């Protein structure tokens, strides 16, 4: 199921429902051995599993990175995405980079290694300021990935008090 979802995202960056349709059109279910196919509920179940295991997945992927990847340089970017739906735990009104007024959004932080390969993604409430996402990334790199000296590179300056980085 996880491979089917990845294939669907590579072929067409649509919704989960479009992934089900794509699997029917391209025989992905048959190729991967899903004798009864799959539906949107199966994909949501898969996303729940990924969410529950995200930390372990990211840690394992980090440990298998290219040997040339630095353990002390990381690239970090923050963006937001507005939502049309009503029921999302993280949705809140906040600074919208797309200029969408009156829309709830989520804030997304993407952490990459020095080669630009993603190592972690984190979702924050939509009213979280960019600077407030920074400390959790330092903590993640230190505690989860075991890196001692870290330089985070972003697209604009983020000022963090020294005592916040030593917690």
Predicted features, each with a name:
Residues 1-167:
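Anion-binding and metal-coordination hotspots
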């Amino acid at each position: 199921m996880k491979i089917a979802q990845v294939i669907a995202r590579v072929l067409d960056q649509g919704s989960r429902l479009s992934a089900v349709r794509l699997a029917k059109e391209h025989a992905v279910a048959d190729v991967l051995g899903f004798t009864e196919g799959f539906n949107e509920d199966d994909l949501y179940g898969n996303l729940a599993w990924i969410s529950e295991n995200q930390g372990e997945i990211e840690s394992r992927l980090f440990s298998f990175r290219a040997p040339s990847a630095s353990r002390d340089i990381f690239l970090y970017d923050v963006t937001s995405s507005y939502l049309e739906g009503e029921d999302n735990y993280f949705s809140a009104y906040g600074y919208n980079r797309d200029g969408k007024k009156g829309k709830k959004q989520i804030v997304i932080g993407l952490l990459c290694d020095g080669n630009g390969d993603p190592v972690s993604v984190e979702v924050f409430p939509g009213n979280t300021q960019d600077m407030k996402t920074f400390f959790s990334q330092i903590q993640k790199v230190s505690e989860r990935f075991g890196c001692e000296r870290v330089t985070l590179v972003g697209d604009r300056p983020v000022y963090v008090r020294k005592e916040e980085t030593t917690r």
